Amino acid sequence: MSELSEPRIPDAPAIQRLPLLQLILVGLQHVLLMYGGAIAVPLIIGQAAGLSREEIAFLINADLLVAGIATVVQSLGIGPMGIRMPVMMGASFAAVGSMVAMAGMPGIGLQGIFGATIAAGFFGMLIAPFMSKVVRFFPPLVTGTVITSIGLSLFPVAVNWAGGGSNAAQFGSPIYLAIAALVLGSILLIHRFMRGFWVNISVLIVMSLGYVLCGLIGMVDLSGMAEAPWLQIVTPLHFGMPQFHLAPILSMCLVVVIIFVESTGMFLALGKITGQEVTPHMLRRGLLCDAGASFFAGFFNTFTHSSFAQNIGLVQMTGVRCRSVTIVAGGLLIVLSLLPKAAFLVASIPAAVLGGAAIAMFGMVAATGIKILQEADIADRRNQLLVAVSIGMGLIPVVRPEFFAHLPLWMSPITHSGIAMATLSALTLNLLFNILGGHERAAENARHAHQH
């Protein structure tokens, strides 16, 4: 379908066009930002399953392939799937705890994980039309709270990167902090003194400079790149036929529900940033793509997929809101899945370089949520309490991940997700305070939102 034929919002930023070179450069920014998260899930599961280094590399390539295809479908819109907004897709962290446990279970392993992923994806496609109707329960009060929580829940990732990453021999070493500060400072200077396209690719510029600097001082690790093949084709069912077991399937179905909750908040955030109203029809298309990607992923040796919150901040900070950018980024992910040496090169970007950029971008996500909260009646004490409690609930797994360690394992997709905790809290309290609180309060809040 042609972008120009889209009748929904003819003047929306999401259907702007850019020259090809600009598309590639801005799309590359999206890939560099999400790459670490995209390969983390297959890396963790591969290690838990006791795979060899070559098999883990194959898992990573499979994930990049599915992430690229899902990103293209989500952004472009094919058939009934795809929200047609600048969305990046990748393996979801919501299922990591459950999948690590499955990997160690006798008789389950990777084949059981892939079977559960396929079944959960099919389940998600069945419930997506019903889940899409919850958009009416996301007024600015709830949306702003959720988006603020998304930004805050991402911040530990940025800080971890800036300190050198989880595997750093000396986390927080002055050299890591200096590199992160240099990257962050360079972004600020570009936004202060430059205009136009230079601002659009500010993250790519400073990450390239940071990479070169780290290379000069010996901080770029290219070990394993020489042994990696130039070309590798991802084949379906590489690890054998998927197996279907009830307990893993039920666990992964719960994960899909949590993914839908998280994705709803992310889609609404993108709608605010790009100036598009996210309708139930659009939300259904987006959730169908999430579920369809997970269904497809199980056959191609990878895991449940969802929209990546990290990239929302990049859309806001650079001001490039056209979905053609993420379509190109999806194509780049597909290329990386076929070229292991190129994938090694991208993976060699030092964590401190990513951290400096991520501090600004993840902060922009939280700032977007705060801006949306201005549209709500935030002077009302009950609404203030809703925001306070929901953000607090969202920060629990961020501040102390082990806080809910003694609860049943099946609850971990909820209790380990700050986004899910904040969203469920905000929805519940809004229902209690404003919807069940009487038509007068609901009408009053609606009038306040329309005034803005």
State where each predicted segment sits.
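Hydrophobic, membrane-embedded alpha-helices of multi-pass small-molecule transporters
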Residues: 21-34, 38, 172-184, 202, ...
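Juxtamembrane interface elements at the cytosolic ends of transmembrane helices
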Residues: 2-8, 38-42, 46, 182-193, ...
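Membrane-embedded helical hairpins/re-entrant loop segments and their flanking transmembrane helices
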Residues: 20, 46-84, 251-323, 446-452
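Membrane-embedded alpha-helical modules
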Residues: 102-221, 329-330, 334-443
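Membrane-interfacial loop-to-helix junctions in multi-pass transporters
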Residues: 175-178, 240-248, 278-286, 320-324, ...
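N-terminal signal-anchor module of multipass membrane proteins
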Residues: 2-86, 94-106
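Short, non-helical or kinked segments that cap or interrupt transmembrane helices
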Residues: 58, 80-94, 136-145, 198-204, ...
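Intrinsically disordered, low-complexity non-transmembrane regions of multi-pass membrane transporters
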Residues: 1-26, 222-237, 273-276, 286, ...
